[in-house]
Amino acid sequence: MIKYTIDELFQLKPSVTLEVNFDAVEFRAIIEKVKQLQHLKEEEFNSHHVGHFGRRRSSHHHGRPKIKHNKPKVTTDSDGWCTFEAKKKGSGEDDEEETETTPTSTVPVATIAQETLKVKPNNKNISSNRPADTRDIVADKPILGFNAFAALESEDEDDEA
């Protein structure tokens, strides 16, 4: 880039003013050409930068967007058991054919049991606008003492009646 001194800039200052009736058609043609070039550059950029880079992000969080993944498939049989079906990472048919043709070792393969876990949130730590129920608060308090003899006596009385 060419650098000019202040004196040179004052000499290069245009002394001619534009006429009131200048040709706007040429000016608009130049603007349209620039718009087309910018559009082509954006298309080229988007073709190379696929994925979340092409998306616009709001400026308040400055983070990458969270890409949602599909939920795993869980099937429930007639007995009520739920089984988790994992994604297959490749074609298993090719691997089975290779192992059948070349029996090199007869080591048993360990399989991982697949289970579905249900997680319950700890509701005491979740804030709410609704006031707490006193029955829940009483149920959460630990029992300070337990009289085993009183419990045995009450069971014996129930058996006799």
UniProtKB/Swiss-Prot annotation:
GO terms for molecular function: eukaryotic initiation factor 4E binding; translation initiation factor activity. It is found in: Cytoplasm. InterPro entries: Caf20 (IPR031456). GO terms for cellular component: cytoplasm. Phosphorylated by casein kinase II complex (CK2). The modification Phosphoserine is found at S78, S91, S154. Residues 52-108 are annotated as: Disordered. Residues 52-72 have a biased composition (Basic residues). The modification Phosphothreonine is found at T99, T101, T102. Keywords: Cytoplasm, Initiation factor, Phosphoprotein, Protein biosynthesis, Protein synthesis inhibitor, Translation regulation. One of its GO terms (biological process) is negative regulation of translation. Belongs to the CAF20 family. Acts as an inhibitor of cap-dependent translation. Competes with eIF4G1/TIF4631 and EAP1 for binding to eIF4E/TIF45 and interferes with the formation of the eIF4F complex, inhibiting translation and stabilizing mRNA. Binding affinity for eIF4E/TIF45 is 10-fold less than that of eIF4G1/TIF4631. Required for induction of pseudohyphal growth in response to nitrogen limitation, probably by regulating STE12 translation. Interacts with TIF45. This is Cap-associated protein CAF20. It comes from Saccharomyces cerevisiae (strain YJM789) (Baker's yeast). The gene is CAF20.
